[in-house]
Swiss-Prot record:
Annotated CDD domains: uS7_Bacteria
Pfam families xref list: Ribosomal_S7
Keywords, alphabetical: Ribonucleoprotein, Ribosomal protein, RNA-binding, rRNA-binding, tRNA-binding
GO cellular-component term (any): small ribosomal subunit
Domain of life: Bacteria
Protein known as: Small ribosomal subunit protein uS7
Described function: One of the primary rRNA binding proteins, it binds directly to 16S rRNA where it nucleates assembly of the head domain of the 30S subunit. Is located at the subunit interface close to the decoding center, probably blocks exit of the E-site tRNA.
Biological processes per GO annotation: translation
Subunit structure: Part of the 30S ribosomal subunit. Contacts proteins S9 and S11.
Protein family: Belongs to the universal ribosomal protein uS7 family.
Matches recorded under InterPro entries: Ribosomal_uS7 (IPR000235), Ribosomal_uS7_bac/org-type (IPR005717), Ribosomal_uS7_CS (IPR020606), Ribosomal_uS7_dom (IPR023798), Ribosomal_uS7_dom_sf (IPR036823)
Length: 156
């Protein structure tokens, strides 16, 4: 279905504690049922745990973790003459960030620590050190793109 107009980007405010737009996006992605205060408590709690364990700037570690998880290339399905090919394409910067946030959160939710604060802080520290489920997901996506490099001429 086509749209008449491109959807406008909504303006979001930076988070109150660190003044960072990406942390606000991360909170919004963690949030369930519009409960922003719960999401804030989880994210700020996780960043406090990271700060106490690593003894360095938690925001810098958060950004490093996001950068380590963000994919540079992915595969998209494309039908050509009755066959469906997995065509590798570059990932746009806004989508890179969105995928990194989504993968970090799903990896944290998949861990088996007691609280979400512990899970998220553990996953952030792992991702910052190029370990963990979220980084594995990125490597799988890159491996898939590498395996299908033969179809890269089907880009659109």
């Amino acid at each position: 279905m086509s749209r008449r107009h491109k959807a406008e980007k909504r303006e979001i405010n930076p988070d109150p504690k660190f003044g960072d737009l990406v942390i606000t996006k991360f909170m919004n992605a963690i949030m369930f049922d519009g409960k922003k205060s719960v999401a804030e408590r989880i994210v700020y709690g996780a960043l406090d745990v990271v700060e106490s364990k690593v003894k360095s700037d938690p925001v810098a570690l958060f950004h490093r973790a996001l950068e380590n998880v963000a994919p540079h290339i992915e595969v998209r399905s494309r039908r050509v003459g009755g066959a469906t090919y997995q065509v590798p394409i570059d990932v746009r910067p806004d989508r890179r960030q969105a995928l990194a946030i989504r993968w970090l959160i799903s990896a944290a939710r998949g861990r088996n620590e007691a609280t979400m604060i512990d899970r998220l802080s553990g996953e952030l520290m792992d991702a910052a050190n190029n370990r963990g489920s979220a980084v594995k997901k990125r490597e799988d996506v890159h491996r898939m793109a590498e395996a299908n490099r033969a179809f890269s001429h089907y880009r659109w």
